Structures are given as C-alpha cells and as structure tokens.
Regions:
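Glycine-rich and polybasic anion-binding loops at the starts of cofactor/ligand-binding domains
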Residues: 1-232
Length: 232
C-alpha cells in the first residue's frame, strides 16, 4: 500500500487513540505498540493469503474512516426479536455494547457480561491481562487497529449452565453497523472466557446500513472440558 496513504491513516488513528484516557500502563503501551506496527505493515495485500481475493486498495487510499457513534436508527430497524425463545441477546451498536437492549434472562447467572468501556474505567488491569492472553502481540493490521482504537466491546464470562452434562448456553449476538449519517468505522473486540465444563453456542448476526468498515475480532479463553460453537 502507498506509504503516504498509510501515514494519513496512522495520523488519524493516533489522534483518536490519544483521546481515550487509559489509567494503566499496559493499555497505554498496547495502543502505542499497535499504532507503531500498523504504521510499519499497513493494510494486508494480495501477498496475504486470507486477503488475496479481497483487495483493500480503495479503503487504504481513502481518508481514514472515522469511528462511528451510537446509532440513532437501530430501534427503527426492528432487528430485536420479540420472543427470546430461551436464547440470550447481546446487542453491539457501532462497536458499543448496549446493555439497555441486551437480555440475558435466558441464561440467568451462568453468563456474566460486561462492557469493555466499563472495564477500562473500573478494572483496567484485568482488561489488560485479558487482552494480552487473548491477543498475543502480532502484526495483523486489523488487530493493530482494534488495539489502537479500543474503546468498547464485550466481555462474556460463561459458567456451566447446570450439573447436567451437555446443557448449552445460547447467546444471540446482534451487531449493528450504521453508516447512514456518513461513512465510518466500527471496531469491536469480544472477549470470551469459558469455565471448565461450560458449553456455549454463539449465534452472531451482522446488519449494516451505509458504508462502514466493520472490524470485529473475538478472543476465546477455553478451560478444559469446555466448548464453544459459533454460528455466523
């Protein structure tokens, strides 16, 4: 990718990244390292096997996609199911965990969910450790963007549903990417910790309106005897 285009992206990402106030060195250093790596490697190109048939030239050569704010149209889209049918629901709106629209009643206390934004404020050391364990340092361009622009996301902590072998916790995750007010980006980090013997089924659904760079990543910490089934 052209160096000047990557420099433009790097400068824009740096400005946004510096607006997030991190209280612990681990998070600050992770942002700084990610930004430095992104400046070095840029976006993936055809030499990267997973992107060989998905050229990103138009993204890399365009102005940096601003991080989108909470949508004003999500509720108008009728995306939320009326009946849960025994499935919990997590809503992520332009990268922001929406506790007000999520419903975990189907899984009770067996699944604990917390926004990464609240963890950044209240438990920054724990978040730093979870990120380090889930996403060891690498030079994947989109992981670098996720680290540099980490603001919100979701941490899902799963315990066994019961003493009955094989019982599965089912969670419907709805991502809404809304670029109706103008093009932009949404960077979502999901952290999943599954205790010994726990089983979970994730049903992930993505809706997009307008032009949005949706950057979604999941880090999974599986204990012995646990299981995760992801449907996307």
């Amino acid at each position: 990718m052209a160096t000047n285009a990557i420099d433009t992206w790097t400068d824009s990402v740096r400005t946004t990244s510096q607006s997030y106030e991190d209280s612990v060195l681990g998070l600050k250093q992770r942002r700084a390292d990610a930004l430095e790596k992104f400046a070095q490697v840029g976006f993936p190109g055809r030499k990267h096997e997973e992107w060989r048939y998905t050229p990103l030239t138009s993204i890399a050569s365009s102005p940096c996609s601003a991080v989108l704010e909470r949508s004003e149209t999500l509720l108008d889209r009728n995306l939320l199911p009326v009946d849960s049918n025994g499935v919990a629901r997590i809503v992520i709106d332009n990268g922001e965990f929406r506790d007000d629209l999520s419903d975990l009643s189907a899984v009770g206390d067996h699944v604990q969910v917390q926004s990464l934004a609240s963890m950044r404020r209240e438990h920054p050391e724990q978040l730093s450790e979870l990120l380090a364990r889930s996403f060891p340092a690498d030079d994947h361009p989109f992981h670098c963007l996720s680290d540099a622009l980490l603001d919100d996301g979701v941490f899902i902590d799963v315990a066994p549903m019961s003493d009955v072998d094989g019982e599965v916790a089912s969670i419907h995750i709805i991502h809404y990417l809304d670029g109706s007010r103008g093009p932009g980006s949404a960077h979502t980090t999901g952290l999943l910790r599954i205790s010994k013997g726990a089983r979970i089924r994730l049903i992930e659904e993505i809706h997009c309106q307008g032009e949005v760079l949706g950057n979604i990543r999941w880090g999974v910490d599986l204990a012995e005897g646990s299981d995760v089934h992801r449907i996307r």
